[in-house]
A protein has these predicted regions:
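Conserved ATP-binding module of the ATP-grasp superfamily
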Residues: 126-128, 149-152, 161-198, 224-229, ...
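A conserved helix-loop-beta module that forms one wall/lid of the active-site cleft
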Residues: 94-162
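A short glycine-rich, hydrophobically flanked beta-strand micro-motif that places a catalytic Asp/Glu
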Residues: 257-269
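Peripheral (often C-terminal) accessory segments that flank ATP-dependent C-N-forming ligase machineries
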Residues: 4, 303-388
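Conserved protein kinase catalytic/activation segment
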Residues: 272-274
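Short acidic-hydrophobic, aromatic-tinged amphipathic segments that line or gate anion-handling sites
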Residues: 50-57, 131-135, 164-167
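ATP-dependent carboxylate/phosphate-activation module, predominantly the ATP-grasp catalytic core
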Residues: 170, 190-256, 260, 280-308, ...
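ATP-binding N-terminal substructure of ATP-dependent carboxylate-amine bond-forming enzymes
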Residues: 1-105, 373-376, 380-386
Length: 388
């Protein structure tokens, strides 16, 4: 099988997806803007050939690269990046070269929050009320219906960049004076007071969930980004039944097959009800794939590659641990030094590292990943690391 991996060098964990595709027999080809000499040895081993482009945003260059590989190796069976930023480019290439997977006729349903809502409604899962902005008067009518506060965010994209909580009409006008918002399509959502619970995993060619997981975010990512705060989250050993039921209903509504998925729900504080927020048909970002590996003693990189290549039946796994992530920000003064953290809880820490600058606003400048057998213990470690 000819698989073309776009941007295999970034983010860093793309190497692992590539490695196991190669291990399971794929003829793996890569396109990226990094010099071949800068690729790590594990990635070089995984790639049969690498085509460097000077600008990954230049579609003509990508078109020529895919054409080159098609002429040399025959039909490309898969084109993947597993990266939210490149999903539209993936769909365009699949459309132009008739490659299996999500194409132009469906991609906006996975990218635009305004289009996701109809699928959430089809699933029967309650969703956040939203309005796609057209003009001030109509927006204020929507706000009158749902009440302040509301959340303004880009219609397309992930993360919390250019996302704002608005508490009154004065703030509304201030936010909409932002040139970026004037030039972009965005939506206004009702504010839901709750924590985020995710439904993550793998769904096979037949629509069967073969691996499932859940992360718990007790902070507002919007507040973390806007206030330049430090983030923490917890990968749970078990998926709550209400999250599982909602997640599988959403997967069925979107008719998801042979993909990673990462679906975000609110658990509303006032009544514990699950409310759908958004869907991402890709692995969860940052260190979350590794968190799933640690929580379940498994290897999701390997299991994804195995699923794509249908190499052998999937290996089942059971969650055992709470895996925590606690970030630090350079501008904050913490009570405990890095050395004190390693001395005190080093036996629980699985990995620690600085974060790439492009992710640091949300994910922190430096972070620790660790696991324990109880929720109480993982929270104590988070508090210790982030104590100021």
């Amino acid at each position: 099988m000819n698989i073309l991996f776009f941007s295999p060098h970034f983010p860093q964990n793309s190497t692992e997806f590539c490695f196991y595709l190669k291990e399971y027999g794929a003829n793996l080809l890569g396109i990226g803007d990094a010099e071949y000499s800068s690729l790590n040895d594990r990635l070089k081993h995984s790639l049969s050939e690498y085509y460097r482009v000077s600008n990954m945003e230049d579609y003509d260059q990508i078109l020529r690269a895919v054409g080159f590989f098609t002429h040399k190796y025959g039909k490309i069976d898969r084109f993947e990046s597993l990266n939210e930023y490149w999903l539209e480019l993936e769909a365009q290439i699949r459309t132009d070269f008739n490659i299996s997977g999500t194409k132009n006729d469906f991609i906006q349903n996975l990218k635009r929050k305004s289009k996701m809502k109809s699928f959430f409604e089809k699933s029967g899962v309650q969703t956040v009320k939203c309005y796609k902005y057209t003009d001030r008067e109509s927006a204020l009518k929507f706000i009158e219906e749902v009440g302040y506060p509301v959340v303004v965010k880009p219609d397309s994209g992930s993360g919390a960049n250019f996302t704002y909580k608005i508490k009154n009409e004065f703030e509304f006008d201030n936010v909409f004076a932002n040139k970026h918002l004037q030039d972009a399509e965005f939506i206004i959502e009702e504010f839901v007071d709750g924590i985020i619970l995710t439904y993550d995993g793998l769904v096979d060619l037949y629509g069967n969930v073969i691996f499932e997981n859940s992360h718990r975010f007790e902070q507002s990512i919007m507040n973390v980004v806007n206030n330049d705060d430090h983030l923490y989250y917890i990968c749970l050993p078990e998926v709550a039944e209400k999250v599982r039921l909602a997640g599988r209903s959403v997967l069925k509504a979107f008719d998801v097959r042979e993909k990673f998925f990462h679906i975000e729900f609110f658990e509303r504080k006032r009544d514990g009800k699950i409310v759908a927020l958004e869907v991402n048909m890709r692995p969860p970002g940052a260190w979350m794939p590794d968190a799933m590996n640690y929580a379940h003693d498994t290897n999701v990189y390997k299991r994804w590659a195995n699923m794509v290549l249908q190499y052998q039946p999937d290996e089942a796994s059971t969650g055992r641990y709470f895996t925590g992530y606690a970030a630090r920000k350079n501008h904050k003064k913490y009570k405990y030094s890095h050395e004190e953290i390693l001395n005190e809880i080093g036996d629980k820490i699985l990995y620690c590292s600085s974060i790439e600058k492009v992710f640091s606003r949300a994910m922190g400048d430096f972070a620790y990943q660790f696991r324990t057998e109880t929720y109480e213990e993982v929270k104590k470690i988070i508090d210790y690391i982030q104590k100021e």
